[in-house]
């Protein structure tokens, strides 16, 4: 049977060798092996070429019909399979928390909440964080890890061990040929920075989610949940994540729920992108050196390791916006401009990861940063296996949250804040798109139009000088030279315009790309909160109608309260880093603009002084 795939999203070809896709279109695959996140196939119009692997779902068997409600005995792992189906799932893990149905204990301790998790049972809509592609990150053995990457090692080889040719510290952005037009796409559609990122198939939902949908698929942000790790959240100064089954918490502050700060903050540099080879030079890849400040021990990672980490984090965290990685590309992977652009994107990504109070302390992230993979591959594999077999995922994420017992939130106020943030993200997304378009167009004009126009002016001045040189009078020589120098000055100013976007506009567009990824994550996070509020309203109505006990309705409201704390904490963190990042970037932009115009002024002043001696 010929390999086929179904397009999950529309894709418009932009480069030679690519083909366009339409959503739901069925394609024929030339090979199931992806090439750096791209597949080759033939679309329904007979065009053959490359397209992103993340945009399609491989069809391996006839699509199943709607699953019948199998009752309590049915495998829970099929509760959240989307209409198009997933790849075959691993066996469902055993129930991790038998006491989930126990009632809430006294306010002094945290008990696992019972069934009836407050979430509506709407149909599942695969999202960017859930369906980053039909090619999903491996959850299986280390052999799967190796086979998926076509690599004899699960870690990046240290520089010098394989191949050579370290790249210098590339601070420049993309060249004039591709810098202005080839920026990150800015759209809240799921084609943002997709690359070949795959989020693994979700594990079996816990009791928190099983009661809600009565066999219907649930929104991915509830069922496709992720463990938090050692981080914490607080209501003002009062909500934290817990390692065990309860921790002391402090009272709420003036800003509402906030993530508790990381007690051991750190940063991580990404340097020395190095081209390496394997299989006697048949395969090449780029390795990056990471140096966390809290260990000062360098580790080397490939992009596929970042890709794997992203998939684990996207699986762990339901109400945390995991920043998107810079996108992949199949061609030009070893060009200096692309390596520089990707490195800058990874630096922004790492900055947001290290500054997030929860993500920064996550075990899998710390393993990624600190495991000396080149000298202890066994430890790397053990940490990888531990992350992939972690049972604290799905709705079990909320079991790791501890909120102040007396800090119940006003659900109407919560709903108002969520609605306000939803409007904010929509407006910010539109504004980011507009600014990105304007910056792209302005950069293009500087690189091509402004440079050309200034050089035309310079050429005209030199033509005038050459005409004046026909006069052989001695007193005319100084003027001729001054006018020629003026022409050269305008040529130099044109070059300054062509080089300037790398210094000011490109960094702004890089920041917009990162935040556009965040904005693409929030609809799912908001959807979880909205569903929880809807479930609370339904439970209250059922109590009034005598269809539900008051105790059960109170439990639903308590669990909605937990979701509200987490959601508002993430929203608050987003605003904090937004203010920090855009303040810093706007300062940098204006400083670079000032430096640029000072250079232009200096060129003009030098030309002006040439006339003093005429």
From Swiss-Prot:
Keywords: Cell cycle, Cell division, Cell membrane, Cytoplasmic vesicle, Endocytosis, Endosome, Lipid-binding, Membrane, Mitosis, Protein transport, SH3 domain, Transport. The keyword Membrane applies. Residues 1-61 form the SH3 domain. This is Sorting nexin-18. Its main location: membrane. InterPro entries: AH/BAR_dom_sf, PX_dom, PX_dom_sf, SH3-like_dom_sf, SH3_domain, SNX18_PX, SNX18_SH3, Snx9_fam. Heterodimer with SNX9. Interacts with ITCH. Interacts with dynamin-2 (DNM2), SYNJ1 and WASL. Interacts with the AP-1 complex. Interacts with FCHSD1 (via the F-BAR domain). A 1,2-diacyl-sn-glycero-3-phospho-(1D-myo-inositol-4,5-bisphosphate) binds at residues 302, 304, 342. It is found in: Endomembrane system; Endosome membrane; Recycling endosome membrane; Cell membrane. It is a peripheral membrane protein. Residues 411-614 form the BAR domain. Residues 141-151 have a biased composition (Acidic residues). The keyword Cell membrane applies. Involved in endocytosis and intracellular vesicle trafficking, both during interphase and at the end of mitosis. Required for efficient progress through mitosis and cytokinesis. Required for normal formation of the cleavage furrow at the end of mitosis. Plays a role in endocytosis via clathrin-coated pits, but also clathrin-independent, actin-dependent fluid-phase endocytosis. Plays a role in macropinocytosis. Binds to membranes enriched in phosphatidylinositol 4,5-bisphosphate and promotes membrane tubulation. Stimulates the GTPase activity of DNM2. GO terms for molecular function: phosphatidylinositol binding. The PX domain mediates interaction with membranes enriched in phosphatidylinositol 4,5-bisphosphate. Residues 266-376 form the PX domain. GO terms for biological process: cell division; endocytosis; mitotic cell cycle; positive regulation of autophagosome assembly; positive regulation of GTPase activity; protein transport.
């Amino acid at each position: 049977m010929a390999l086929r795939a179904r397009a999950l999203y529309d894709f418009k070809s932009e480069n030679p060798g690519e083909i366009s896709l339409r959503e739901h279109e069925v394609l024929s695959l030339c090979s199931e092996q992806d090439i750096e996140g791209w597949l080759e196939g033939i679309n329904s119009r007979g065009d053959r070429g490359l397209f992103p692997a993340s945009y399609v779902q491989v069809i391996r068997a006839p699509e199943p019909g709607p699953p019948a409600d199998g009752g309590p005995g049915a495998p829970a792992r099929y509760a959240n399979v989307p209409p198009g189906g997933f790849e075959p799932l691993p066996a469902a893990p055993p129930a991790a928390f038998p006491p989930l149905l126990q009632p809430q204990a006294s306010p002094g301790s945290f008990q696992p909440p019972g069934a009836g998790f407050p979430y509506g049972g709407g149909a599942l809509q695969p999202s960017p964080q859930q369906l980053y592609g039909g090619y999903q990150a491996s959850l299986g053995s280390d052999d799967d890890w190796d086979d998926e990457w076509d690599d004899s090692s699960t870690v990046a080889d240290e520089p010098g061990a394989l191949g050579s040719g370290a790249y210098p510290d590339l601070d420049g952005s993309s060249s004039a040929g591709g810098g202005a037009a080839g920026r990150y796409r800015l759209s809240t559609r799921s084609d943002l920075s997709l690359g070949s990122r795959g989020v693994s198939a979700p594990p079996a939902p816990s009791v928190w989610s099983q009661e809600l949908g009565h066999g219907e698929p649930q929104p991915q942000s509830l069922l496709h949940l992720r463990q938090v790790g050692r981080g914490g959240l607080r209501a003002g100064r009062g909500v934290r994540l817990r390692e065990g089954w309860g921790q002391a918490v402090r009272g709420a502050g003036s800003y509402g729920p906030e993530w508790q700060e990381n007690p051991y903050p750190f940063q991580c540099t990404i340097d020395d992108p190095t081209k390496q080879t394997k299989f006697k030079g048949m395969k090449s890849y780029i390795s990056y050196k990471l140096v966390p400040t809290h260990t000062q021990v360098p580790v080397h990672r490939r992009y596929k390791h970042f890709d794997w980490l992203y998939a684990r984090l996207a699986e762990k965290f339901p109400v945390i916006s995991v920043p998107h990685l810079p996108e992949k590309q199949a061609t030009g992977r070893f060009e200096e401009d692309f390596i520089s652009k990707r490195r800058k994107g990874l630096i922004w990504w790492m900055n947001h990861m290290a500054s997030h109070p929860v993500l920064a302390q996550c075990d899998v992230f710390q393993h990624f940063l600190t495991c000396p993979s080149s000298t202890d591959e066994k430890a790397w594999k053990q940490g990888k296996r531990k992350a992939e077999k972690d049972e604290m995922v799905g709705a079990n994420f909320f079991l790791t949250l501890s909120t102040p017992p007396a800090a119940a939130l006003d659900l109407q106020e919560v709903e108002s804040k969520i609605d306000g943030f939803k409007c904010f993200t929509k407006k910010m997304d539109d504004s980011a798109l507009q600014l990105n378009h304007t910056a792209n167009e302005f950069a293009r004009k500087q690189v091509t139009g402004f440079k050309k126009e200034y050089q035309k002016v310079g050429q005209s001045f030199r033509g005038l000088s050459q005409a004046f040189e026909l006069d052989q009078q001695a007193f005319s020589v100084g003027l001729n030279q001054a006018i020629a120098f003026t022409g050269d000055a305008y040529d130099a100013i044109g070059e300054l315009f062509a080089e300037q976007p790398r210094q000011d506009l490109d960094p702004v567009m890089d920041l917009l790309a990162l935040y556009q990824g965040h904005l693409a994550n929030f609809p799912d996070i908001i959807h979880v909160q909205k569903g929880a509020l809807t479930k609370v309203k339904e439970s209250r109505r059922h109590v009034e109608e005598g269809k539900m006990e008051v105790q059960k309705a109170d439990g639903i409201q308590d669990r909605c309260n937990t979701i509200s704390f987490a959601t508002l904490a993430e929203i608050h963190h987003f605003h904090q880093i937004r203010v920090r990042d855009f303040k810093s970037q706007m300062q940098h932009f204006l400083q670079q603009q000032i430096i640029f115009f000072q250079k232009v002024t200096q060129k003009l002043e030098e030309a002006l002084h040439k006339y003093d001696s005429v």
